[in-house]
Amino acid sequence: MSYKPNLAAHMPAAALNAAGSVHSPSTSMATSSQYRQLLSDYGPPSLGYTQGTGNSQVPQSKYAELLAIIEELGKEIRPTYAGSKSAMERLKRGIIHARGLVRECLAETERNARS
């Protein structure tokens, strides 16, 4: 028995089709270009703060990069379970990279909140 998450609870409204249902998991996984499109449409979550016009592109690019890395990490999960050593190493490196980007995004959010 495999775990199938409730995608409707975690997918943005733009990913829902016209009937209000979610596409199958194989077709509903957003690509990095779709994430970037969503990001350019809505921007990163602001946590209730408005961003200044000075460095507003920096957090968006970091956030978009983080989303792209997370998507790439998802591709390494199945080969890792199948025993692929190279996929396991890519997964480890990707997690380390993503953790660094999360720290950078949080620091940027805190800087924007203070200004």
Curated annotation (Swiss-Prot):
According to the UniProt record, where is the region Interaction with CDK2AP2?
Answer: 20-25
Identify residues that carry Phosphoserine. Answer: 46
Molecular function terms, GO-annotated: DNA polymerase binding
Q: Which Pfam families match?
A: CDK2AP
BP terms from Gene Ontology: DNA-templated DNA replication; positive regulation of protein phosphorylation; regulation of transcription by RNA polymerase II
* Post-translational modifications reported in the UniProt record: Phosphorylated in vitro by IKBKE at Ser-46.
The entry's localization annotation reads:
Nucleus; Chromosome
**Is-annotated flag, keyword Disulfide bond?**
yes
Q: Which domain of life is it from?
A: Eukaryota
Residues annotated as coiled-coil are none
Q: Which GO terms describe its cellular component?
A: chromatin; cytoplasm; cytosol; nucleoplasm; nucleus; NuRD complex; perinuclear region of cytoplasm
Which InterPro entries would you find in this protein's record? DOC_1/2 (IPR017266)
For this UniProt record, give its keywords in alphabetical order, as a comma-separated list. Answer: Cell cycle, Chromosome, Disulfide bond, Nucleus, Phosphoprotein, Transcription, Transcription regulation, Tumor suppressor
Function as written in the Swiss-Prot or TrEMBL entry: Inhibitor of cyclin-dependent kinase CDK2. Also acts as a component of the histone deacetylase NuRD complex which participates in the remodeling of chromatin.
The entry's family comment says: Belongs to the CDK2AP family.
Subunit field text? Homodimer. Component of the nucleosome remodeling and deacetylase (NuRD) repressor complex, composed of core proteins MTA1, MTA2, MTA3, RBBP4, RBBP7, HDAC1, HDAC2, MBD2, MBD3, and peripherally associated proteins CDK2AP1, CDK2AP2, GATAD2A, GATAD2B, CHD3, CHD4 and CHD5. The exact stoichiometry of the NuRD complex is unknown, and some subunits such as MBD2 and MBD3, GATAD2A and GATAD2B, and CHD3, CHD4 and CHD5 define mutually exclusive NuRD complexes. Interacts with monomeric unphosphorylated CDK2. Interacts with CDK2AP2. Interacts with GATAD2A. Interacts with HDAC1. Interacts with HDAC2.
Report the protein name in the record: Cyclin-dependent kinase 2-associated protein 1
